């Protein structure tokens, strides 16, 4: 249940970074093509019901800092809502936060690098 590598990253390493959760530009609605990734994460969470997780949204540097911070928080909340509503994860186990553009994993100098910075992280609490 759940991809073994994803399960290992979250449960053993304590952090799972995902790039398979998609949103339209400046929007916080989870796109349908994200459901495969969400389904795998939900399977892991439902398999280990006592684990609590923080969902953290990140953006690239396009746009104003404050707008990106707000957007990242709204996106993390949307991911939580989808996990609860569509995949039966207990929402009491999930907290959300957003970092905006403050923690890039790559320079924001190319479209490919910006895509790396647009991510959702799941952190075991």
Predicted regions and their residues:
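Periplasmic peptidoglycan-binding/tethering modules of Gram-negative envelope proteins
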Residues: 1-52, 85, 89, 125
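Periplasmic OmpA-like peptidoglycan-binding domain that tethers envelope proteins to the cell wall
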Residues: 29-35, 48, 56-125
């Amino acid at each position: 249940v759940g991809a073994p590598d994803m399960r290992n990253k979250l449960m053993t390493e304590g952090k799972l970074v995902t790039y398979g959760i998609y949103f339209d530009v400046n929007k916080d609605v989870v796109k349908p093509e994200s459901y495969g990734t969400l389904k795998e994460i939900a399977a892991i969470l439902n398999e280990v019901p006592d684990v609590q997780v923080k969902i953290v949204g990140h953006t690239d540097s396009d746009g104003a800092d404050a707008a990106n911070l707000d957007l990242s928080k709204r996106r993390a909340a949307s991911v939580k809502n989808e996990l609860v509503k569509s995949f039966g994860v207990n929402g009491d186990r999930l907290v959300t936060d957003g970092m905006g553009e403050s923690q890039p994993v790559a320079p924001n100098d190319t479209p490919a690098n910006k895509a790396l910075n647009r991510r959702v992280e799941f952190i075991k609490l």
